């Protein structure tokens, strides 16, 4: 029997179901949404709109479809029948004090949020479930093997070959999500664009450069990046800015939300190949960045995360404002800590009006403090939030 790994978002979803009539859970395909809501709400009826029979019923006769499901229901992949949202609104309006009525999941954030804002604003709690965090899988094993296989639950639960599993994942994503979100005649061109983006994870976003390399218009490149964001493939990290300087970069950085997917798209076929790959530093940085996003998403909280880059090309990988105050974080994939890694942090910290905490997250195993900078091993990222 497979061991089910508990998800950190679970308690928050249960809390929301006691407070709101509708709970919406978004996130990428195969991040574990269905498994989670089924385990948390076993007494709810369940229907999956990926099933063409159910989807046709929901589209043709939504009133009858909802009527036969009862007052407690989980509807999976709700974006496949978006007209249901207005009918769900009517049912919620009939019993506004009934909480946990509908548990909805979806993997296309753009359409879902548009539908919720139009039909269910104020009635819905919204959370995002990303693939496993490092703490959810118990800290991981070898660094490069962990990053190479990525964090999608099925790869862990079923011991799947990452390259094979992620090739199927990509094909499904292109056929189901991309075709639905945009009129792309040539999916091979979009796949080329996706691979080009993978090679730029952790870099400043340059849509014009991407467009030129892919042979598409700049406007198309921006549209496709928005599609990748809406379907939880990538995320943009905004720049930190303040009135203290007009010379700060205003360009976001782009990160993939799973390192295994990056490795697959780049043709990295083993952990050993990743360990010596020229983009291993960017992939490690991608891992750390997604861990921060997962920390906040798993607690139902909005994150306050930026990158810093000034006119002198000085950079800080991550600026985070949390309950413990502001922290500045450098990210290094090396396994042996070096004091100079913290020097940029100390120089730039003077820009900030308070006294931020300084950290280097690195690829080693020893937690130590050097010259006022704490060096945090990759397995211990969660300790930054304690």
Name the predicted role of every residue range.
Residues 1-14:
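N-terminal pre-Walker A segment at the start of P-loop NTPase domains
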Residues 33:
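Conserved lysine of the Walker
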Residues 36:
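Hydrophobic positions on the alpha1 helix immediately C-terminal to the Walker A/P-loop
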Residues 74, 101-107, 128:
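Structural recognition of the conserved hydrophobic beta-strand(s) that form the central parallel beta-sheet
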Residues 85-104, 118:
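Conserved catalytic/switch belt of AAA+ P-loop NTPases
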Residues 110-125, 141:
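Short regulatory helix/loop adjacent to the ATP-binding pocket of P-loop NTPases
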Residues 160, 164-326:
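Accessory nucleic acid-recognition modules appended to NTPase machines
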Residues 364-386:
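Domain-level recognition of nuclease-like catalytic cores that cleave nucleotide substrates
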């Amino acid at each position: 029997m497979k061991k089910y790994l508990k998800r950190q978002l679970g308690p928050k979803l249960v809390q929301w179901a006691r407070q709101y009539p509708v709970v919406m859970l978004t996130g990428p395909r195969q991040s574990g949404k269905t498994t989670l809501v089924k385990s948390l709400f076993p007494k709810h009826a369940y229907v999956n709109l990926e099933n063409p029979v159910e989807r046709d019923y929901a589209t043709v006769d939504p009133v009858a479809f909802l009527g036969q499901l009862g007052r407690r229901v989980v509807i999976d992949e709700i974006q496949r029948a978006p007209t249901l949202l207005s009918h769900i609104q009517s049912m919620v309006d009939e019993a506004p004090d009934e909480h946990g009525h509908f548990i909805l999941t979806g993997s296309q954030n753009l359409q879902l949020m548009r539908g919720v804002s139009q039909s269910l604003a104020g009635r819905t709690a919204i959370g995002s479930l990303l693939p496993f965090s490092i703490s959810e899988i118990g800290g991981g094993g070898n660094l490069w093997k962990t990053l190479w296989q990525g964090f999608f639950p099925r790869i862990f639960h079923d011991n799947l070959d990452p390259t094979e599993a992620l090739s199927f994942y990509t094909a499904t994503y292109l056929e189901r999500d991309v075709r639905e979100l945009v009129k792309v005649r040539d999916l091979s061109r979009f796949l080329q664009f996706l691979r080009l983006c993978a090679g730029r994870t952790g870099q400043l976003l340059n849509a014009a450069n991407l467009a030129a390399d892919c042979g598409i218009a700049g406007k198309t490149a921006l549209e496709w990046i928005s599609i990748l964001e809406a379907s939880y493939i990538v995320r943009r990290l905004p720049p930190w800015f303040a009135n203290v300087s007009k010379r700060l970069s205003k360009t976001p950085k782009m990160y993939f939300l799973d390192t295994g997917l990056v490795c697959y798209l780049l043709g990295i076929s083993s952990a050993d190949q990743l360990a010596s790959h020229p983009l291993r530093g960017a992939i490690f940085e991608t891992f750390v960045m997604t861990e921060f996003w997962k920390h906040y998403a798993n607690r139902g909280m909005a994150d306050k995360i930026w990158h810093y880059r000034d006119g002198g090309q000085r950079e800080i990988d991550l600026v985070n404002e949390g309950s413990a105050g502001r922290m500045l974080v450098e990210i290094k994939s090396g396994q042996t800590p070096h004091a100079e890694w913290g020097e940029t942090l100390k120089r730039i910290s003077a820009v900030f009006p308070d006294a931020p905490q300084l950290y280097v997250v690195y690829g080693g195993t020893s937690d130590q403090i050097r010259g006022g900078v704490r060096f945090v091993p990759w397995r211990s990222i969660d300790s930054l939030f304690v």
